[in-house]
């Protein structure tokens, strides 16, 4: 279904776009020239049974998939998909609440996700393991290179509607949003907009096996008047595109150094989310990610580590 929806969307919306999904086959050890990141040194822990079930956000998959394959001793009849999934933030939160995942690698939860966990009587633990930047993207030909925090809020609340107002061309601003409960939308609402109401998102229709054509939040389209948002790692490594540029905020670019020193305004933590009654194997993996070897993997994949790495 997802493949057909993607095909249909491309037919209805030709041109360059950014879709927050990936081909997980690129992160398999049996694929030639795979994109898995190796550990520094021999694995300091290994799993031979009772493997933790991992899931999470699209942008976190390279981290937890690389860890899974590096730390697991996998028998021949092993069904990897029972333990390694990428159902994205919204569904990953549902799975951890329902007990169908042991660790999910995600951004902070939305208010709705917190309430659903509370309603289910589930206590979730949030362990930060990496630092990331929430970034704003525009067409590379857009003359605007930086916005202030207030200008960002004004654009996405509808108070500013023309690029000329912020030093750009005399063009209407086309804003693109992310679906409710996605990691990007949660950060946008909580850390960027704060209490300012956003304008309604653009929508598109896609095919649903159950309901025919349904409306969903439209994906970013990189027209010369567009602005959208995502996470730095996704925009610069997983979906790098020379036709897209990242804006500075308050004149500060979202570089690794500015994430590390906290100067970039929208620095966020990536979390490992677990249930409070986690297994010993799950606890072992959570703790490993905070060790120098685990933090080195975080750094080598392309994130900013929170703790010391291996020399």
Where are these regions (language model features)?
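Exported/periplasmic ABC-transporter solute-binding proteins
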Residues: 1-132, 137-311
């Amino acid at each position: 279904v997802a493949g057909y929806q993607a095909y249909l969307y491309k037919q209805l919306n030709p041109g360059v776009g950014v879709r927050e999904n990936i081909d997980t086959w690129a992160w398999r050890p049996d694929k030639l020239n795979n994109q898995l990141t190796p550990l520094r040194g021999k694995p300091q822990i290994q799993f031979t049974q009772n493997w933790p079930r991992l899931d999470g956000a699209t942008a976190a998959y390279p981290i937890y998939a690389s860890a899974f394959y590096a730390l697991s001793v996998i028998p021949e009849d092993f069904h990897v998909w029972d333990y390694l999934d990428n159902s994205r933030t919204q569904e990953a939160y549902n799975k951890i609440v329902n007990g169908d995942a042991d660790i999910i690698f995600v951004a902070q939860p939305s208010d709705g996700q917190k309430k659903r966990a509370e309603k289910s009587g589930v206590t979730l633990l949030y362990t930060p393991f990496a630092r990331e930047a929430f970034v704003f993207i525009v067409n590379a030909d857009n003359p605007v290179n930086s916005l202030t925090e207030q200008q960002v809020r004004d654009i996405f609340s509808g108070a500013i509607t023309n690029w000329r107002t912020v030093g750009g061309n005399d063009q209407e601003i086309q804003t693109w949003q992310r679906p409710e409960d996605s990691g990007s939308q949660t950060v946008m609402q909580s850390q960027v907009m704060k209490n300012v109401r956003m304008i309604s998102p653009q929508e598109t229709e896609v095919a649903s096996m159950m309901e025919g054509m349904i409306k969903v939040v439209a994906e970013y389209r990189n027209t010369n008047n567009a602005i959208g948002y995502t996470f730095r790692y996704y925009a610069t490594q997983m979906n790098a595109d020379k036709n897209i540029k990242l804006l500075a905020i308050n004149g500060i670019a979202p570089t690794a150094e500015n994430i590390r020193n906290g100067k970039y305004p929208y620095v966020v933590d990536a979390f490992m989310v677990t249930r409070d009654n986690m297994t010993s194997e799950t606890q072992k993996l959570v703790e490993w990610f905070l060790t120098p070897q685990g933090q080195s993997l975080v750094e080598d994949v392309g994130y900013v580590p929170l703790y010391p790495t291996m020399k």
